[in-house]
Every structure is written in C-alpha cells, then in structure tokens.
Amino acid sequence: MPKRTDLKSILIIGAGPIVIGQACEFDYSGAQACKALREEGYKVILVNSNPATIMTDPEMADVTYIEPIMWQTVEKIIAKERPDAILPTMGGQTALNCALDLARNGVLAKYNVELIGATEDAIDKAEDRGRFKEAMEKIGLSCPKSFVCHTMNEALAAQEQVGFPTLIRPSFTMGGSGGGIAYNKDEFLAICERGFDASPTHELLIEQSVLGWKEYEMEVVRDKNDNCIIICSIENFDPMGVHTGDSITVAPAQTLTDKEYQIMRNASLAVLREIGVDTGGSNVQFAVNPANGEMIVIEMNPRVSRSSALASKATGFPIAKVAAKLAVGFTLDELRNDITGGKTPASFEPSIDYVVTKIPRFAFEKFPAADDRLTTQMKSVGEVMAMGRTIQESFQKALRGLETGLCGFNPRSEDKAEIRRELANPGPERMLFVADAFRAGFTLEEIHEICAIDPWFLAQIEDLMKEEKAVSDGILSDLDFAALRRLKRKGFSDKRLAQLLNVSEKEVREHRYALKLHPVYKRVDTCAAEFATETAYLYSTYEEECESRPSDRKKVMILGGGPNRIGQGIEFDYCCVHAALALRESGFETIMVNCNPETVSTDFDTSDRLYFEPLTLEDVLEIVRTENPWGVIVHYGGQTPLKLANALVENGVNIIGTSADSIDAAEDRERFQKVLNDLGLRQPPNRIAHNEEEALVKAEEIGYPLVVRPSYVLGGRAMQVVHSAEELQKYMREAVQVSEDSPVLLDFFLNNAIEVDVDCVSDGKDVVIGGIMQHVEQAGIHSGDSGCSLPPYSLSEEIQDEIRRQTKAMAYALGVVGLMNVQFAVQDGVVFVLEVNPRASRTVPFVSKATGVPLAKVGARCMAGISLKEQGVEKEVVPDFYAVKEAVFPFIKFPGVDTILGPEMRSTGEVMGVGASFGEAYYKAQLGAGERLNPTGKIFLSVREEDKERVIKTAKNFQVLGYGICATRGTAQYLTEHGLIVQTINKVPEGRPHIGDALKNGEIALVVNTVSSDPQSVSDSHIIRQSALQQRVPQYTTTAGGEAMSEGAKSRDHLGVYSVQELHGRLKNRN
C-alpha cells in the first residue's frame, strides 16, 4: 500500500547532545529520515538541541528548531507548527522518552498528533521491564529470572530469589545508565540507589546473572503487512556481562550453526510481532548458554539504535531511511534498494561476503579516577569498524583504526598474573591480553576457562600469534610474494611486520612495492555480488580482482576523523561532510576515507566514493595509488589526518589548502613565536623545557601559576595548571615523558582573563571572520568544555575590532587557505594570543548555525581554488540575537570522578540555545544540556577567597528571583557584610546537618562551588560536587557559570522557540 496521504507534516525528534551511550549514530539516522520523508513530499519539522549535527543544517528539514528536547519546549513547537504526526524512533532514548512524556501530559491528544514508527504502547511494552518479560513469556521465549522493583525492600527480596552475582537494570534509560553487576550486598545497595535515581519511572529490574553466556543481536525490519527481514546478525566477541556498546562485535555471527541461526531468526520476528513494531527497525538481543545451547531474550529496542547504524554500514542497507518510509505506510516490497541501483527491492534480505568487526574506543585517560572495568553500564565514547574477507583481517584492521597507537595485536604484558587478572576482569584492552596469554604459553582451554570468550575466536588469535612468532624468527628478505601475501590476507599491517622484524615501516613498504603486492578493493553491495552495483562503497583486501574502477575525473579526497573520542567528535565529521557536499556541487568527484560507523560521512551517498578504511599512512597511500586524486584535504578531520600530513607530502601527495609547512609553523612553539614577534602580537610569557631541572629554572623566570603541557595535543591531553614548584615537579614525574624531541611547554596562566574563540576563512587573498565567541568560563578551562556566546556579551567594540585585526594579520602571515581558529585571552583590556589552529575547529558547526554562513563549505571551496569573492562571502555576519554553545559531560557514568573543570577536555558533546538576550540563550543552553533549575529551594554558594567579590552579583540575582541563599562560613560572612541575607551551612567535615544532607533532602536548587588548587580543599569539597551530581542539582565550578545562570534564570518564564530558517532569513534581509 502506498504512502499515507492524510499526513502532511511530520515532526522528527532528534537525540540531543552526544553522550556516552548515544553518539552521532542518531545524526546519521535523523538525517536519513529527513531526506526520506521530504523525498515523498512531506513537510518535515525537526527539533534537536545539538548544533554539531548534519540534521540541523537548514537545508535538511523544512523547519528546524535547535531547542532543548523536553516535552514543554516541544509542546511550544507543536502549537506553532501543528504537525500531523511525530516520528520518535530516530533520536534514541531521548526522543522515545520525550514522545512518551508528550503522550502522558496530554499534548498529543490536545493537538491531535499521531505517533508513527512506534506506538505509545509498543514503546512502553519494550521499555518497561515488567511488561516486556510478560510479553516474552506469552510467546514462549524465556528471559533471565527477574523481578521488577520500585523500592529498596522489594529489590532486596528479589535479590534473595536470584542470588549473586546480580544484574541491576533501570527502566527507560540508555547505555545501561545507572545499572551494573553486584557481587555482594554493599555493591547491590549502592547500584540500586543509583539505578532508582537514573530511571525516570523509579523502576529497576533485578535479574539473574547470565555472565559468560554468548551474546547475539539481530537487526530486524518489519512493515505493516508483516513482511520481516533480518538485516544482519551480530555476535559479541565479549560474553555477557559487558554492555554490547562496550563489546567487540562481529557481523555476521560466526559461531552459530544454521539451525541455531534459524531458531534465533524466528524468535526475533516473534518478538517484533508481540511488541507491535510494525513500521520500522528494531534490534533484539539474545544470550545463549554455551554449555547446553539454551537461548534467552535479553531485551529489544523499538527504535533505530547504535547497532542499526553499525548494521547499516556493515551491509549497506539504509535501515533509518527504510524505517522512515515504512512509518508513513509503505511496505518493504514497494521500496527499492539504492545500493543495487534499484535492481532489488528493499524486501530482499542483505547477504554479505565479508566479515565486519567493531571495536569500541574508550577515554579513561581523561578520567584517571574512573573505574575502567567493563560492566553493564556503557563507558566507551566511540567505535571503529573494519571490513575484511576473514575475521583475522577485519579484526587487525579495526585494531589499527582505533588510533590508540596499535598496529595490530601489540604486546601489553609478559606478567602471567597480570594477564590472568585482565582476562578475568574485562577492561578496554582485553583482546590484547588474550594475545599476550598465547605468547606467555597459556593453552586455549586455560584462556577460555578464565574469560569465557568463544574458543573459535580464541583459535583465530592463537593462529595470528603463531604467525607473529614465525615472522620475528626470520628476516625481511625471507618474505617472498606468497609469504607476504599470506600475512597481508590475515590483516597484518606493514608497521606490525616492521616491529616483528626490527626494521622500519618504510623498508617493509618498499619491499612489498618491489614485489608488486598491493590490496584490491571490493564493493559493499548488500547482495554478495549477485548483482552489479554502481555504488562505490569500498573496502580493501588482498585478493585477485579489484572492483574499484576509478574514474579519470578531477578528484578531491577528504580524510575523516576516525572513531569519536573526547576532544575529537562529531564536529569534525560535520566539517568533512560539508567539504564533500560543497566540492561535489562545485563539480569535483569526492572521495571520503573514514572508519567510524556512526557518522554521516560514512554514508555511501554523502560522497561519490567511500573507502571504509583505517586512517593510517599505509591504508591512505594505497587508496591514493588506486584513485590518484588531484588533491587531499587533511584539515577537517581533527588531529587524525593532520598527523599524516607530513608523511603524505613526503610521498608526493598534493595536500590542498593551508600547507603542511604552515600547519607546522602554527603548532611548533619556536616558529610560531617568531610569527607573532614579526607581527608585534602578544603571547602570555612562556618557555620550553626538555627536562625537569630546566622546567623548574624556567618556571621561576615566568612566575606561577603556569599552564604546563606536552607539545602537539588535541583536547588538552595531560595539561595542567600548577601553582608551585612542588606541583610542577610532580607533573614532570608523573604525567609526561619529556625528551629532546618532545619538550614540555610552560605558559604563564592569566588569572580571571576572558577567553575568546574566533573562526575565520581565507582564500589566500581575503580573510573573512566567521564569528567571535566570548567564553563564559574564564581562561584556564579548556575551550571545548566552556560555554560560549556569539556575539560576545560583554566585550567592548574596540576589543572586538582589535581581535579582528590580529586574526586577519595571522591568517595572512601563515598563508592560510581554508579555515583557521584562534584562541585569545583578554586581561584588563590587553589581548593575548593563546593558540592558532590553521584547520577546522570544533566551533565551526556552531558558528555556521548561528550566522547562517556554512564555513566548512566555504573553506573547502577556497582550498579547491574558488575565491571568497566568487562565492559571495565578503563580510562577517553578526547575528542580532544571541547564540550560546554549552558543553555536556559524562560524569554521571563515572562515579567518583570529580566534576571540577580544568585545562583537560572532558565533555563528550554540546548543545546550543538561542535567545533575544544573552540570559535567555544561556538558560536554554542549560536546559538543553539537561540542567533543571527547581523553581523553589536555596542557592548554595561556597567559593574560594578570590571569587567572593564576583559572587555577590549572582547571590543578588537569585535573591530577586525569590530564592534563599545559603553558604559555607567564609562565603556567608563575606556576603552578609555586603548586605545579603544568608543562612550559614556546615561543610561536610564540620559536623551535621551539613551541605551533603541539605542536597539529599532536596533543599538545594543550585550549587556554585569553586576551590583553590591545593589538593586538600579539592578533596574536602569533592562530596558537595558528587552529591549535587547524584541528586541532579545544577552545579557550577566557576563563578562565571553561576553568574550566567543567575542572569538566565530571569527569563525562564518567557522562553521563545525560534526556527533556524527564520533566524537566518532575518540575517539575510538585514545584510
């Protein structure tokens, strides 16, 4: 039956900011859904608070709202736009929960809006643990023994029934938030308390543990005529007990017999029928007992998920696009498969003739206090995917795509006790310890006994270790064509072979080239080569026939950013996608190289050709050899491609845009200093030190406090503010490895300076400022973690003009062609240059959304030789409204990690708020970031000596709004002396009742807590920040943040909603 004609406009709810458990896979699904529905003639209205997404680009939907995703805001949008239906299955758990809130609060009934894609009942049945269990029993499928609980007493009674270890799963959360595995009563009580808080319905499932069972997932699509297809079966390398988002996964499933596969296939179709998903995609998770084959259902997601993004990329079947069309009434047989050029219908089940491996990427180095053991609560921040013709090839390609310094199964330890520990308690590198165990002489049976990973997977790694041993016993010239080809087919990189042979990677590469041994490229075609495909979606392997068939058009190759991590996230993918779109429009053939399955850049129709490959020198050079591009762009994927720039130039690759030499001039301290001196610009006093003694001497020359860091970093890794020689000594000994080649940088720290970010674009002749952003948090907080406002909310016009002048001077001096970002600090009216990055920065998407100028597209065209004049981009656009970007943090996933912000970046994502005043925009950004300010209660202030004066204004603002003020002794005394009425409250060490009690009792509406840097005061006040985090009370660890919130709260009762299209239209008419 064709599409529904009774629906004219559809509202899509996005997933909001990137958090652990919900990353950019929902930008990919949302963008696909927008395209699919507009193709069919529907008016699409979109709401999403995350500006760094492709889906919030003004051309993706008819009307786009970058607004907080909460039912109250969405109700305003519904009242304004009057959609006929809402599609809630494209925005992860955020969108589902928002849709349920709209239904429960009567909004859908009031405006007569229908939920499509999943009914309220189907969402509830799948997400409510108790109802789901009943539904499974009804169709004869077993679930683990479990009980639904709403109180601690019920939970304790349930625990006695299921025994230890016990699994705790909260309802209506994602990424296993709040859940965990308890091995004793203390752990059980702690996890339950956390879980009740995390579940919006205050409900937990207490479940029997099936640790060590094998875990599988099925990606299923079903239409309203009950046509069902399995897109892909996925098998977890890690057994049950590790969240599937933190597990290494393989597709298709490798260790099922055909009979077992058919049983699981039938079960997953039965689950969809019973839950009532009849218009879209779902994923169903199973566990199988390896001892006797018993199969149980773990859970299902009635929506597009992280796994469906993986399944889409693994097979080439666009699940989100198909699901969106099914939601408006199409059936699978009516839709065509794009990859085969329409030769097959969408009801044709994909089959694949290769193996896909996904490995998660973690960021524990950012959270030294966090527990890095993997459990049922998700902790990874990104993932990498690789394809090969064998499991060994795809596994080794995925390892080197992770960008954690691996080039294969690099050794981690020779200590048998440590290896045993790592196998038994899964951590982020367990697969490497499996390899170490084989090297150390463990047998396959022993390893399986300790870690419960399937013997078939273990045998694959064992075989690779035998190969490694044989290679390291020989010399390079022993490897003839046949021997080297055999190793390459098993996925060994040149670099890993070089390590084993004790030679350089270049020598291995030259030896391989001399033997004329190169990979071929195979196409992803959804049908295992049954039909020919025009779609150039390619992966490398060492076989006979190459299917790449390159054209002879003028081509530009764009290197992507690889797996998401803290410091390099979706913002860089956004820039890569824009480069591909712009250059395609300008008549170039575009080639994308990337290995992140969550992103829009790895969608097969974003660029003309997609190579799904690791971003290593070896892999990139082979693609260049095959495609022979006119130019390569390395400036848009963050640090990943920049690291390859010099080596690519050495190998004769034409890098377009800003030259590798200019990038080096900006990143190399001594060269950059010379550029600034020549221009007469100021930097904070700084020095370079190559060892500890030198650092201590030079520190005295500049004076404390200092910012110290290693050279060449992104996301402020291992950066610290130190206040004394003792702290500096500790840093030099514990945090960094210093040498002649990698010195440590010392900068004088500008206290209480205002930090400013500027993005600009240049074609080599003209420079246009994209936007000037004033940071909310003072200098010293990493720019990626700081809120910022465009236009600036308190900088004078003179200072802004001086910043413009300096930015342009540096762009000319460095010969920038494309984008450039500068960070300034302004102290007492003096402008200092902190750093310059002649590349795309993480603020580019935000600036583009705020000003309506697509900077990344403009920059890419400049690189390809199209001038700013020709593009009609000649002057800076300054909005007549305020846009505020705010960072979003993962602290709730890492109990015990302190929330104090500093120079090391720790945010995973961002949101944007738009308003007529700075206050309104800031308040909306806080709502978007998940902060909820209670209308009643007290404001708690506890600040260090130098912040007391600044906090007076904050206290007065909140008092006017009717809040009571309470503070710790010193702060209270100071505020009382300045005419405020303040209640004094005990710090935790001072006896009860103390601030911790007040937070637990719900008396506190907001916390402003700043501390001096000495470890004692940090640890004394740690409990305040932890309690605030657990009680979900908004907290600010800078006075600037607290003050901005006090301004913002004034406008909370009259917040407007503005579409991007109306805002940009206003700016166009004004200019």
From Swiss-Prot:
Protein name: Carbamoyl phosphate synthase large chain
Chain intervals for the UniProt region annotation (Carbamoyl phosphate synthetic domain): 549-930
Keywords attached to this entry: Amino-acid biosynthesis, Arginine biosynthesis, ATP-binding, Ligase, Magnesium, Manganese, Metal-binding, Nucleotide-binding, Pyrimidine biosynthesis, Repeat
Family membership noted in the UniProt record: Belongs to the CarB family.
Gene Ontology molecular functions: ATP binding; carbamoyl-phosphate synthase (ammonia) activity; carbamoyl-phosphate synthase (glutamine-hydrolyzing) activity; DNA binding; metal ion binding
Cofactor note: Binds 4 Mg(2+) or Mn(2+) ions per subunit.
Protein purpose: Large subunit of the glutamine-dependent carbamoyl phosphate synthetase (CPSase). CPSase catalyzes the formation of carbamoyl phosphate from the ammonia moiety of glutamine, carbonate, and phosphate donated by ATP, constituting the first step of 2 biosynthetic pathways, one leading to arginine and/or urea and the other to pyrimidine nucleotides.
Entry coiled-coil feature ranges: none
Region called Carboxyphosphate synthetic domain, residue ranges: 1-403
Cofactor section: Mg(2+); Mn(2+)
Gene encoding the protein: carB
